[in-house]
């Protein structure tokens, strides 16, 4: 099973979300920053690496806050998606790979076209079932 990790990054009441690039897989769909765990990495180490690559930041990966499984028709294997609470310096966040990144209020997340694997988590955030008391980004 493929392990994929994603970070919930919050600053000043907003959540960082990322739009995939035009022309790539799942183009222009929204997601949380993160990616595939490689080799012998732990999920937390994989997320820290992905955040360096995608956002140019050193992250403090906190507690696991949500876990789900999903199978895309385009993929041969099921994936396990693990969300972590993450602390970064908000002012240091740079868009390194996405079409765009945005800081959004949880009440506006449902307006975005998220990847299917992220939608259950987005719903929980919108209903305030998680994330409200998680660590926030510095800055």
Kindly give the residue locations of the regions a language model identified.
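Conserved N-terminal beta-strand and adjoining loop/helix that marks the start
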Residues: 1-16, 36
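A structural microfeature
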Residues: 17, 63-66
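Active-site-adjacent beta-strand/loop module that shapes the phosphate/pyrophosphate-binding cleft
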Residues: 3, 58-59, 68-93, 102, ...
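Conserved hydrophobic "DFG−1" position in protein kinase catalytic cores
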Residues: 9-10, 17, 86-88, 103
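Charged phosphate-binding loop/patch that engages nucleotide di/tri-phosphates or the phosphate backbone
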Residues: 117-139
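Conserved Nudix-box catalytic region and its N-terminal flanking loop in Nudix hydrolases
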Residues: 14-53, 57
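NUDIX/MutT-family hydrolases
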Residues: 85, 94-125
């Amino acid at each position: 099973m493929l392990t994929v990790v994603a970070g919930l990054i919050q600053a000043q009441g907003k959540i960082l979300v990322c739009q995939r690039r035009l022309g790539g897989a799942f183009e222009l769909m929204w997601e949380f920053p993160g990616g595939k765990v490689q080799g012998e990495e732990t999920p937390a180490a994989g997320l820290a690496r992905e955040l360096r690559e995608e956002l140019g930041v050193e992250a403090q990966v906190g507690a696991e806050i949500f876990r789900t499984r999903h199978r895309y028709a385009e993929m041969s294997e099921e994936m396990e998606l693990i969300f972590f609470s993450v602390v970064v310096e908000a002012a240091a966040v740079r868009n390194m790979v996405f079409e765009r990144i945005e800081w959004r209020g949880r009440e506006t997340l449902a307006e975005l076209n998220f990847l299917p694997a992220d939608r259950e988590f987005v719903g929980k955030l919108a209903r305030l079932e998680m994330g409200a008391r998680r660590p926030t980004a510095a800055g």
